[in-house]
């Protein structure tokens, strides 16, 4: 296997997990300060 491919396979799950945690945290904080914002039509 190519060394770059192995590095890609091992780093993508870590980066995607961190990205999902960051996105969820941002949504949770927005929902905490503006609880009705998810129901308004922007």
UniProtKB/Swiss-Prot annotation:
It holds the Pfam family PSI_PsaJ. It comes from the Eukaryota. It is a single-pass membrane protein. Keywords: Chloroplast, Membrane, Photosynthesis, Photosystem I, Plastid, Thylakoid, Transmembrane, Transmembrane helix. The chain crosses the membrane at residues 8-28. The keyword Plastid applies. Belongs to the PsaJ family. May help in the organization of the PsaE and PsaF subunits. This is Photosystem I reaction center subunit IX. It comes from Cyanidium caldarium.
